[in-house]
Design a protein with these regions (language model features):
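Pyridoxal 5′-phosphate
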Residues: 1-394
């Protein structure tokens, strides 16, 4: 039985061209970038060339790119680094102790690593969660209303990893710049899928991940706009402008850069192809009785389809589809193994049973029309079969 992978939002296979670019850095150009000899300098050159390639994709300067081990680390560095810097600055100003805690704003549909980092910081900082509408869209005016003098950071996800909704990051960034508040966006799902310009979009901090764009796991980035100060989470040799001490993973970073290069060359045509397949999938799935689309009908990532079915559990759908050779998910790969309903879907106003009946299908570079047709043939049968035995039906 042929297996069809439709869970590209969870992770992507490494592109063979990326693999080939990485190979020399495992056994030939393996030097430590901090070493003065030729092995180290060759590695250092590859690192800096990769930094330039990645920076170019988002309109940043090379020195504004900090390589990390993952999007989770980048998001933690953005939130905690900003919070610790604010505390340090207040301490320098000899502010009263009661004034030490600043204010952080996030949305109610952030990735778990942002939610948990903010929760951890709430022991010393006030955290406000901005609600979303039924499509999972944040109203920039709600953010503007919540910003106050002690607000140190606004962190809003760019493209939802679960429902695919794209936020108006440019408008949010403009508001934050006018209010002189640092603005971070988690672009883990949008980076390498839609065009991003950090300068035009008024972004101060941006998170991205390699394994979401056909690069290797174990490497991510944090864009840090020139002039933005963060306190590092890791202390040691002072790599990555002192913000991320550790021996640099050159092979993975080279792979990340190659993945960015490949995306940039074919971005327009690939996005159009994915949108065509996505829209076909949505149109045909919504013909199934009791089906509804989650997320915004238009402002969504080009590869994301998230639907729900009356009287059908998402976990059952995933298992039955897997038996037919199709890999999908119920939501975020970081939480879909639990039985808890998605906090993202609940934030859009769905009831628990509706959130439990959702299925996320995400397309990618190797998704074909034939794959989509196969899923469209199998899915109605699977939904009908599960519905027949559903305890919720009557």
């Amino acid at each position: 039985m042929k297996k069809i992978y439709l869970d590209y939002a969870a992770t992507t296979p490494v592109d063979p061209r990326v693999e080939n670019a990485m190979l020399p850095f495992f056994s030939k150009k393996f030097g430590n970038t901090m070493s003065l000899h030729s092995f180290g300098q060759d590695a250092k050159l590859a690192l800096e060339q990769s930094r330039e390639t990645v920076a170019d994709l988002i309109g940043a300067k090379a020195n504004e790119i900090i390589f990390t081990s993952s999007a989770t680390e980048s998001n933690n560095l953005a939130l905690k680094g900003s919070a610790f810097e604010a505390s340090t600055e207040l301490s320098r100003m000899s502010m009263p102790k009661s004034h030490y805690a600043g204010h952080i704003i996030i949305s109610s549909i952030e990735h778990h690593c942002v939610v948990e980092a903010a929760k951890w910081l709430s022991r010393g900082f006030e955290v406000t969660k901005i609600p979303v509408d039924k499509y999972g869209t944040v109203n920039p005016k709600d953010i503007e209303r919540e910003i106050r003098p002690e607000t140190i950071l606004v962190s809003i996800i760019h493209g939802s990893n679960e429902i695919g909704t794209i936020q108006n990051i440019s408008e949010i960034g403009k508001i934050c710049r006018q209010k002189k508040v640092c603005f971070h966006t988690d672009a883990s799902q949008s980076f390498g899928k839609i065009l991003i310009d950090v300068k035009k979009m008024n972004i101060d901090l941006l998170t991205a991940s390699s394994h979401k764009i056909y690069g290797p796991k174990g490497v991510g980035l944090l864009y840090v706009r020139e002039g933005i100060k963060l306190v590092p989470l890791l202390h040691g040799g002072g790599q990555e402008n002192g913000l991320r001490s550790s021996t640099v993973n050159v092979a993975a970073i080279v792979g990340f850069a190659k993945a960015c290069e490949i995306y940039k060359k074919g971005a327009k045509s690939e996005n159009q192809r994915l949108i065509r397949l996505r829209d076909k999938l949505i149109k045909e799935i919504l013909k199934i009785k009791g089906s509804r689309l989650n997320g915004h009908p238009k402002n969504r990532l080009p590869n994301n389809v998230n639907v729900r079915f009356d009287f059908v559990e998402g976990e059952s759908l995933v298992i039955h589809l897997d038996l037919h050779g199709v890999a999908c998910s119920t939501g975020s790969a970081c939480s879909s193994a639990t039985l808890e309903p998605s906090h993202v879907l609940l934030a859009t106003g769905l009831r628990h049973e509706e959130a439990h009946g959702s299925l996320r299908i995400t397309l990618g570079r190797w998704t074909t029309e034939k794959d989509i047709n196969y899923l469209l043939n199998v899915l109605p049968k699977v939904v009908g079969k599960i519905r027949e035995i559903s305890p919720f039906k009557n």
